[in-house]
Amino acid sequence: MKLSAELKSFQKRLGHQFNQPALLAQAVTHASMSTANRGDNQRMEFLGDRVLGLVMAEALLRLDNNATEGQLAPRFNALVRKETCADVAREIDLGAVLRLGRSEMLSGGRRKQALLGDAIEAVIAAVYQDAGFDAARALILRLWGDRVHEVEEDARDPKTALQEWAQARGLQPPRYEEVSRKGPDHAPIFTISVRISTGETDQATAGSKRQAEQAAAQALLAKLETSG
């Protein structure tokens, strides 16, 4: 099959020329757009998640020969969580080429964290099926970039620290809510609030939901530490 101009442009952003273009077409097709003659990316997302996990586990082991399983687990989780996958998807503007059904399109599907995270995993699976594990690994390490090297510092991030603070006091996990989203699709600004079960709350604004959640958690932690 021939790719559309949009998908050809996306191939360049991705840095992989597909030998089997149909794999890429399926990887960007959401279940809301699938038909009897055109599959969706759900099964590919399942495979891509496993390929991503293997690549990241291998990379972390190579970076730190002395790390324990307890140290590696939070680093691994930080690299493969949906927020990180969605951030990577945004960096290559994957949302612009997603094939969505009308209802999903109208509800802002191109910006949804879950859809973007699933789609980048499906794209990883497409590269794996098209060119093998080495090609998929090279793609992942290039797209994730410095995140792999910086994750050690971020393993115990403010969200994790706040959750541990709450658990140590027998409280429910903190709750995060989107207060507002402003700005254009390519440069959104999110305001996120966080609340713990004793009623304390704070909020923060940033260019991604994850960054805003982390900043809100940091602000609330600072407030809790000040109040004793």
Curated annotation (Swiss-Prot):
Question: What Gene3D superfamilies does the annotation carry?
Answer: 3.30.160.20, Ribonuclease III domain
Positions binding Mg(2+) in this chain are 45, 118, 121
Q: Name one Pfam family in it.
A: dsrm
Which positions are catalytic residues?
A: 49, 121
Alphabetized SMART domains for the sequence:
DSRM, RIBOc
Where in this chain does the record put each DRBM domain? 157-226
One annotated Gene Ontology cellular component of this protein: cytoplasm
Where found?
A: Cytoplasm
* EC number of this enzyme: 3.1.26.3
* Cofactor needs: Mg(2+)
Q: The RNase III domain covers which part of the protein?
A: 7-132
Q: Which reaction does it catalyse?
A: Endonucleolytic cleavage to 5'-phosphomonoester
Q: What does this protein do?
A: Digests double-stranded RNA. Involved in the processing of primary rRNA transcript to yield the immediate precursors to the large and small rRNAs (23S and 16S). Processes some mRNAs, and tRNAs when they are encoded in the rRNA operon. Processes pre-crRNA and tracrRNA of type II CRISPR loci if present in the organism.
Q: Which family does it belong to?
A: Belongs to the ribonuclease III family.
Quote the NCBIfam families the UniProt record gives: RNaseIII
Question: How does it associate, per the subunit comment?
Answer: Homodimer.
Please give the name of this protein.
Ribonuclease 3
Species per Swiss-Prot/TrEMBL record? Roseobacter denitrificans (strain ATCC 33942 / OCh 114) (Erythrobacter sp. (strain OCh 114))
Q: What is the lineage of its organism?
A: Bacteria, Pseudomonadati, Pseudomonadota, Alphaproteobacteria, Rhodobacterales
